[in-house]
Structures are given as structure tokens and as C-alpha cells.
Amino acid sequence: MTTFSKTPLLDTIKTPEDLRRLKVEQVRQVADELRQETIDAVSVTGGHFGAGLGVVELTTAIHYVFDTPRDRLIWDVGHQAYPHKILTGRRDRIRTLRTGGGLSGFTKRAESDYDPFGAAHSSTSISAGLGMAVARDLSGGKNNVIAVIGDGAMSAGMAYEAMNNAGAMNSRLIVILNDNDMSIAPPVGAMSAYLSRLYSGKTYRTLRDAAKQLGQHLPKVIANRASRVEEYSRGFMMDGGTLFEELGFYYVGPIDGHNLDHLLPVLKNVRDMETGPILVHVVTQKGKGYSPAEAAADKYHAVAKFDIATGTQAKAKPNAPAYQNVFGQSLVKEAEKDEKIVGITAAMPSGTGIDIFAKAFPKRTFDVGIAEQHAVTFAAGLAAEGYKPFCAIYSTFLQRGYDQIVHDVCIQSLPVRFAIDRAGLVGADGATHAGSFDNAYLGCLPNMVIMAASDEAELVHMVATQVAIDDRPSSVRYPRGEGRGVEMPEVGVALPIGKGRMIRQGKQVALLSFGTRLAECEKAADELAAHGLSASIADARFMKPLDEELVLKLARDHEILITIEEGSIGGFGSHVMQYLADQGMLDGGLKMRSMVLPDEFQDHDTPAAMYARAGLDAKGIVRKVFEVLGKDYAAEAVKLA
């Protein structure tokens, strides 16, 4: 029986050069097949879904009109880049998305020449694009630079900083605003499409430039009035572009991002413009072409594997509550007793558990958008007025507000409470989203209390501890995913500041854990016991202030002391070693080792596989103990077998 391909035209396209050989009448079919291929692929792998479906036509049109990769195409964030990957020589690997050794879920320079700039954090595309445009001009090049940015990413100040700079420099840069939340655009239609083609066309631009040159020779009053007439007439017919025009961009739009008859001529006109920065405002719909995603854009922003026919996602039943949910629920319980508690998120309410708090206390919840710098200083302002702000931000995104943490929070010792989600390795999102550095970048700051939860019950108590800390900033870090399934306390109880806890008492080896590697320490201790080695286990709880009494006791009572953490060099282990060195404890016979993440950016995989490669699982800990003892782990394992 003969089988027919569902994507016959797409099958002929290996690179955008193949796409550009097609007749314009065939582009619509390519887009339809590209959408089907995207749906099929993500149903197998999971990943970011809705945004990619929303830019299928735009992606096809850009690669059809522009000479990529000579023309530089930069995708902001990269959530929407799956169709782009399919068209740019990576279709044969698209079903390896976000898996070990497979394609990245974001754009990545090392992966393809069609990814000239990597992304995963938002609002960077215009800055990068401007840098590339200036480099082109300095080198005498003629290629285009296109930055595609979503309206959500336009909530970050960096995007406007870049646009302001681009407008002042008058560099030839094309910014495509992908407005998929209707947060900026008025209704689009035939008149808007016609005007966009008119205003992006060479005739209008030539007349406009000629009028500007004429205006330079007219009396100032007349020239100013003529300029205002042109501006007002464009504003009257094309509502929405005034802000961008004020920043120095030539505004075109809004146009229907799913109508290729509108997109193609406008992009061709824009491609052929020779001066100045241009913003093309394109309106799209998240999840376009897949009805479940169209109906529930929030649920299909990022998905697990799913059944195409029903849209049902294959999510495993959790064995324990997710850490972000434990945080959200704990914060609600504390806020029921304290009306000064408020919750802050930077556009990640469900990811951080702040959505749970928002349902209970909508007026005490603040989603500031993709604006981590603002979120931190906003929290500082609330703290200065006696409120108790909980600023819940992923570890990787908190990096974006670092100066504010130093200058606005720590120097003033304001009691902002940082809930640092996604601490440690996060798996499929890879290096760009790993929470590897907060131990190091917060640990060097005076006045900061730093905690790490070893399990979900500890997180409940640490939230209560943060409520009680009212004279300085504090942070608690916890990972992505489920807890351990431990018994949960009814209420959180504030912990003694700077005090850890002993989990197991042994003799020869001390394992001092900071964070959720405690479970691996317990497994390692069991294996060491099978080899005849007695191991103590301690949960540090606090990195700052350090439990000096506990650290000294472990150092004095054991031959080997090993610290274990889910962070980079310069973190918890460095603090322990610094203290022991100051106390002269490293001058004698103590064998001290610090187990941290490797000093490299790890590619995406499952968290378990990534931690195993880093040597931060139970086997890695046991191997480290044998290494310190001068024994071969493999040989010892054979003896035990």
C-alpha cells in the first residue's frame, strides 16, 4: 500500500535556500505543512508549543524574503524557534528537542549558522541585533539584521534601552514585534494591511525623505508644522506606532501575522529600505492552527508529550508536591496571619507558586512583568515602608537584578525575602536556565541570610523563618520539580538563624550537605556503610550565617569532611573552607573536599543524568570518599559484589 507524505512540499526543503526557489503561490502550503510538522514533533518531545505555532507564517515569510543566514535573524527568548529549526536544516533532529545530545529548545550559536545569536532569557534581541548592525556598517557590509521580539519581552527595560540607542544611531536594523497577546495592537484588517504596504513602500519613503530634506531649507516654524502633520496623519491612520516613532524607529503595522498576502509584500519593502531602524508590528495568535492550544494558550505555552487528537498531555502523577506549590501554599498560610506579607513575581506566577498566593490575596500580589531589576527595587520600597515582600524569581533570572540586590537591598539591609526557585540544574532547558550561581553571587554580599531547603518540609519552615527575619534580607533556594514525599508539617516554625542539623552520626567521614543533595548523601552513607565506612550526615540549612559550631565539630571528629551542594565554585563549600582555614583546621590531618557543579555550562538532559555527570549523585559521593582515601572505587565495588 502506497503511503503519502503529509508534508510533500516541506520534504523538499533542507535549507531556506530551497524555500526561496519556490513560487510565491506555494509558500502558503509550506506554512501549513510546517505547522503540522511542528505539532507532530512537539507531541513526541514536549516543549514550548504555543509561541511556535503562532509564528509559522512569519517564520516562513522571513526565510522566503530574506537571505538567511547572510541576513542575520535573531529570535528573542527562542520559545518560538522550533519552526525556524525545521526550515534551517534541523528537521531530521527535531524529535530530539530538549533531550540529552539532541537539539536545544532555544537558539544556539553552536548548533547552526542560522542561529547567529543564542537566546533563552528575554529582551536581548534588539541589543544584539544593533551590535551586529553596527559591526556590519563598520565592515562595509550590506546584509540585513532582523530581530523578532514578542510583546511580553517588550515589558523589559533592556528592549527600550536598545531601541533608544538604535534610534539615536539611525542604524539600519529591522525589528519585528510579534504581538501575540493583543496587548499593544488595535484590530487589524484590510485597511491596516494596505496602509502598511503603502508606508513601507519605496515611493512613500522616498517622498518622505525628500520632504525631510526640503524641510531643512524651510523656516523652522513651517518645517515643524509640516513634520507634525505627517506624524499626526500616520498616527490617525496607524494607531499604535507613536511610541516607536518617538524612539526613532519607522513604524509599519499592525499587520496580520497569519496572512502571507500581507506579510510578504511588507517584508520585501522593509528588506529593500536602505536607511534607519524599522519596526514591523505583526499580530499573531498563540497556538494558531491547533484548536486546544488556541482555546487555552496558557496551558499550551509549554507542554509535556501529548495526544494530537485530544490535546491530552502525558503528565505523570506526582509522588510528592512540587516545590513551587509548597512555597505558594506556605506563603498563603503565613499571609493569613500577617497582613503585611505581599508576593512579587516577574512574569512567572505559576512557575514560582505565586499564582497560589494570588488566588488567596489578589490585592497583595504583584506581577511586574519581565522586569527583574524593577521587581527587586520595588520589593525594597515595600520593605522600607514596613511590608514583608516575598520576591519569587528563578535563580537564573535573579541574575538580571543583581545590582539592585546589592545597591537597593543589601547595602540598606532591607528585609526583602527572596524565594529562589529552579536552584541547581533544571534539565531540559539546559545551561541558560540552570540555577548554578546564586550561592556564589549572593554569598559574597554582607547582610544576606542564605538558606537552602533539603526537602519540602524544610521549605515550609524556611518560609516561616523568612517572615521572622525583619532586619535584613534573606533568601531560600529550592529546585525544580517534586519534593521527596516526606511528612509535611501543619504549620511552619521559624528556625534558629545560622544553625544546621545532624541527620546521622558516624565516625570516619562527614558529609555536609547544603540543599536537596541531602537525599543522595543518605544513599551514599548507606553504600559506604556496606564498605565498612561510617559516615555522619549533616544538613547545613544555612550558608550565611554559617553554623560554625557544627562545621568545627565535623572537622574535629572526622578524618574526612566533604561538602555537597547544587551550585558552582565559590559557593557553600568555599565558605566552609574559608572558615576552616581561618581557624587553622586545614593545617593538620583533616582531609577536606568540596563537591560542586563542574566549572562549565552543562547542556540539557534530565536532571538525574546531569547530576550524575557532575558527580553529585550517591555514586559520585562514594567515589569521592574512596578517592580521598586513595582507593579505587571500581575495585571496591567489585569486592562488595
Curated annotation (Swiss-Prot):
Binds 1 Mg(2+) ion per subunit. Thiamine diphosphate binds at H79, A120, H121, S122, G152, A153, N180, Y290, E372. This is 1-deoxy-D-xylulose-5-phosphate synthase. Its EC number is 2.2.1.7. Catalyzes the acyloin condensation reaction between C atoms 2 and 3 of pyruvate and glyceraldehyde 3-phosphate to yield 1-deoxy-D-xylulose-5-phosphate (DXP). Belongs to the transketolase family. DXPS subfamily. One of its GO terms (biological process) is glyceraldehyde-3-phosphate metabolic process. It is an enzyme of class 2 (transferase). Keywords: Isoprene biosynthesis, Magnesium, Metal-binding, Thiamine biosynthesis, Thiamine pyrophosphate, Transferase. The gene is dxs. One of its GO terms (molecular function) is magnesium ion binding. It comes from Bradyrhizobium sp. (strain ORS 278). Mg(2+) binds at D151, N180. It holds the Pfam family Transketolase_C.
